[in-house]
Amino acid sequence: MSQLEQVIKSRKSVRAYDPEFKIDKKELEEILEIASSAPSSSNLQAWRFIVIQDQEKKKELTPFGNNQAAIDASSAIIAVIGDAEAYKNAQEIYAQNVELGYMDQAIAETYATNTYNSYSTLPQQVLSQFASYDAGLISMQILLLAKDRGYDTLVMGGFDKVDFAKRFELPENQFPIALIALGKAKAPAFNSSRLPLEKIVTFY
C-alpha cells in the first residue's frame, strides 16, 4: 500500500480533540498553500479561508456550529468560503501565468477576456455551484495534508451560515460552505462502513 493510500484510509472524522495541543500558524499556512494546488473551474480558485485559532473567537463560533465540542477543543478552525465573483480575478491569475513563463501575453489576455465574459453572464446560482464544487476539491486536499502530518480533522457542514456570514462580515459575493476542525485526537474516531463498489459504480 502506498503512502497516499495509507493516508486516505487512515483519515477519519474525529470529534474529540486535545484542547492543549496547538498547531502553529506557519504550518497551517503551509497546508493551505499546498492544498491550493487543487484543480478549479477555469483555474479561478473560487475559494477563500478564514482561519480561527484564537480561543475566544472559537468559543464565539461554537453556537453557530450547534455547540459541537470540536470547535472549541480543536487547534484551529478553517472556515471554507466560496467566492461567486472569482471570475473578476481572471486578469490577475493569467498575468501571473505570464510572469511565471507558463504562457505568453497574447494567449493570457485572450484567456482572461474569454473567462471573464463567459462567467460574468452566468446566474448567481450557477456561480455558487462552481465555487462550492471547487471548495470541496481543496477541502479534501486540506484533510489529507493534515492527516499526512499527523493531525486529525472534522468537516462540519451543518452550521448557521447566515449568522457566520454576518459575524465575519462576508461581502455579498462570498458565502460560507464548511468548517474544518484541525488538531490532535483525544479519543479515536468511530469506524464507518462504505457501500460496496457494485452499489455505487456502473461500468459500460
Map each language-model feature to its residues.
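Acidic, surface-exposed loops and disordered segments
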Residues: 1-204
